[in-house]
């Protein structure tokens, strides 16, 4: 059986797009930023990664240079800040089971027990997560393992969102929060047990996989990124 692509949980397959009306050529080392131009107008497309430890900062200089030249940044989605109580409640409600159902109803006893065993490493239990749908649980597992591997971090998108807010740069978004919630809520629909069980099986590989992906991303090694993220699956 083909494994569910955990790599797609751990790194951004999507792009953050930075645009500026008038930008000259940017001389830089190879990294994951590409320029599309017509006349004096240019759009810079930056490949981003959502899990990036603090040790990976500062970012390659091209990211900063491109940001400084840009007047508008276009991100994947605007996620609610931790202080946005209404937004956080909306996410939690959209990713939780309703009508008395729980994760126990969608996974086998064996998988539920395996989840319990894994969560015991963090002083938690499967029952504490059972209110959430499998997509949310799987993403939480990846975040927890990244934290344990000392690889957790805010990521490139969040970093530039903060800079844009600080500097008063315009920000736009490709997707709505409702779309993101729906996508995550329906992740693994019909294959809930497989999603959780294979996520648990793949977590031990996360540290090495993330390190390889981050290295390829920093170097703009699209061939290696294809190998890690696309060709493998």
Regions found by a protein language model. Give the residues of each.
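Compositionally biased, intrinsically disordered low-complexity regions used as flexible
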Residues: 1-3, 15, 23
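Bacterial N-terminal signal peptides
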Residues: 10-20
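Bacterial N-terminal signal peptides that target proteins for export
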Residues: 2-10
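Structured, acidic catalytic/metal-binding patches in enzyme active sites
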Residues: 24, 32-233
């Amino acid at each position: 059986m083909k494994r569910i692509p955990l790599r797609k949980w751990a790194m951004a397959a999507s792009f953050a797009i930075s645009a500026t009306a008038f930008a000259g050529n940017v001389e830089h080392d190879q990294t994951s930023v590409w320029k599309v131009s017509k006349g004096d107008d240019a759009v810079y497309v930056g490949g981003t990664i959502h899990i990036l430890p603090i040790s990976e900062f500062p970012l390659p200089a091209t990211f900063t240079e491109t940001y400084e030249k840009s007047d508008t940044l276009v991100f994947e989605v605007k996620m609610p800040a931790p202080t946005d109580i209404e937004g956080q409640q909306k996410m939690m409600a959209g990713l939780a089971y309703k009508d008395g159902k729980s994760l126990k109803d969608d996974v086998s006893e064996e998988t539920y027990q395996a989840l319990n065993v894994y969560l015991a490493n963090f002083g938690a239990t499967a029952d504490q997560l059972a209110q959430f749908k499998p997509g949310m649980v799987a993403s939480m597992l990846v975040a927890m393992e990244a934290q344990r591997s000392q690889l957790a971090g805010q990521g490139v998108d969040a970093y530039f969102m903060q800079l844009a807010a600080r500097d008063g740069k315009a920000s736009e978004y490709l997707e709505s929060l409702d779309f993101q919630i729906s996508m995550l809520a329906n992740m693994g629909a019909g294959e809930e047990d497989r999603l959780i069980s294979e996520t648990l099986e793949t977590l031990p590989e996360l540290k090495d996989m993330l390190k390889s992906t981050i290295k390829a991303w920093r170097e703009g090694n699209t061939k290696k990124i294809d190998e890690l993220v696309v060709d493998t699956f």
